[in-house]
């Protein structure tokens, strides 16, 4: 999981620092403080690695929307540093220790990726001015608080710099012998050092628009888990009107960020064809992991939490239009009917989309304002289910969530809260420093965290 970000020059994020804890990280604060900008950065990072700086910038609305505005101009450079730590699948990692590969020891990968993006009006594009990627193996998970102490003695340290003549230079500062496997065309020799040979290899492929992690991911299957950690998470802001739009039967399964794709996902689950069987699919589709495949029975049990009248769900392909028709069997007392998806309530469709996304996506990175359209009772149920689904199997994972709902906050823990404010045009995130006292007070009084947040009882760090 990504454990911390340091950002300067991205929208309202200036001299911005945020440490992420495993589990839920709930962003709260008034409108306009930059909560969505925080989530947008992670989406930007995902496209930056999966594609290139110009496309990532265009995806978020162009340079004018991404680079920080200063008076009547904008800051021409974005700098960022991202740290993370994730467990390795030792069976797939050739350069893991023999003890780890035999299952006797758990291995974790610690990484730091720092970069500077420059918008050049001369070339009308966004390019990397500088990048540095550092990576090492450890025998335990390292949090953001421990990083300054543990972020030393790297196994791999690569830096790429854009010179004044617009040519790229590469420097491999460190390359442990076992990491030679990262470079498939690496040929050892006595005439030069391993670091120099690695530099020659990287020079063939590094450009001003190539992210170092993207390069390593594509040339080394052993680094695919790095892609899952930095790119794989999905961001959701479900819009019921988008869920109701008819979908073609050829559309691939998977819930999109706006909720579209529900029909195709349910159709694939009905046909038991959700998981991709090609073992090389993840390798050639950087960062896009195969979807999980729960049973429809499991999904229906979750659907009934919001609407007990739902007895069954069916998906059929209209042979004339090739549109997918989703119908829900509704039973309420003596009343029985087959209701099409387009006639279901907005709240029910949002609940169904959120739960289907959580159960099928390889990872869920952020959810914006899940309380919209949901009954107050279901808001608390949603938090409980998110913990149950997202973190039961992935202990070292985190999910961001934005909310304005006191009801939803009443089901959250003080340690999960991040209070966001705007100071001098800059987004500032803080965690409450009186977590223990607040937890004791909640236990004694019976009031929830939302009550104390509204009352202003949270102390900032």
What function would you assign to each model-found segment?
Residues 6, 19, 81-85, 114-118, ...:
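Residue-level recognition of well-ordered beta-strand positions that form the cores
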Residues 87-89, 241-245, 427:
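Short, acidic Gly/Pro/Ser/Thr-rich loop/turn segments
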Residues 1-51, 295, 302, 309-461:
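Switch/communication elements of ASCE P-loop NTPase nucleotide-binding domains
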Residues 76-78, 111, 231-232, 362, ...:
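Short glycine-/polar-rich loops that comprise or flank the Walker A/P-loop
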Residues 40-127:
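Conserved P-loop NTP-binding catalytic core
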Residues 99-289, 293-297:
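Electropositive, glycine-dotted interaction segments
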